[in-house]
């Protein structure tokens, strides 16, 4: 199969729709399907497990290495408390700008609110690895200088445009075209 013509808008749209969605998707924050189960917290603070954990599930006590994305944008784990308490609606909830305490819980990562980690964002590896492309030439000026006509001889011509201008009348009689349908003279009526 040949490559599509990417000069047309329909081909461009078709090509973008066929891209791998994982390249531009938001990363999934759940590490295993067991995180999706609704778990009731035990008064001791440890979430209950209904059975043996699957082989792919994450152990809450184990340290998971941070990804490059997590290092660059300063994420932390969300507390495993009730939903109202994490959103600041529960009893004893503090202001919205305070960071939630990192407790070993379900392992869901949350991005910070506001400028909490501005220093971490300023020192990302993307900024360190950036190199400006040197192959760029400066753009040319788009202003076009008006051309001036310089005459070497003087004439009796007045500079105003209407001084003596007269449009030439050209009357040309065209040769008759026998294949033309409506070439009849005006008073003649064609019966179709």
Swiss-Prot record:
Residues 43-58 have a biased composition (Low complexity). One of its GO terms (biological process) is microtubule cytoskeleton organization. It comes from Bos taurus (Bovine). This is MAP6 domain-containing protein 1. It comes from the Eukaryota. GO terms for molecular function: calmodulin binding; microtubule binding. Residues 36-106 are annotated as: Disordered. A lipid is attached at residues 5, 10-11 (S-palmitoyl cysteine). Palmitoylated. Palmitoylation enhances association with microtubules.
């Amino acid at each position: 199969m040949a490559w599509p013509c990417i000069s047309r808008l329909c081909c461009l749209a078709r090509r973008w729709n066929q891209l791998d969605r994982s390249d531009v998707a938001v990363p999934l924050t759940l590490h295993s399907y067991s995180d999706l189960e609704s778990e009731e917290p035990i008064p001791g603070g440890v979430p209950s497990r209904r059975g043996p954990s699957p082989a792919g599930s994450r152990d809450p006590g184990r340290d998971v290495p941070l990804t490059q994305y997590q290092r660059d944008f300063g994420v932390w784990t969300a507390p495993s408390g009730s939903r109202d308490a994490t959103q600041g609606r529960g009893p004893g909830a503090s202001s919205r700008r305070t960071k939630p305490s990192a407790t070993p819980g379900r392992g869901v990562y949350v991005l910070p609110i506001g400028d909490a980690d501005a220093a971490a964002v300023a020192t990302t590896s993307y900024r360190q690895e950036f190199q400006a492309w040197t192959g760029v030439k400066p753009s040319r000026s788009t202003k076009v200088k008006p051309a001036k006509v310089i005459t070497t001889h003087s004439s009796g011509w007045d500079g105003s445009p209407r001084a003596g201008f007269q449009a030439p009348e050209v009357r040309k009689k065209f040769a008759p075209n026998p294949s033309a349908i409506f070439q009849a003279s005006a008073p003649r009526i064609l019966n179709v």
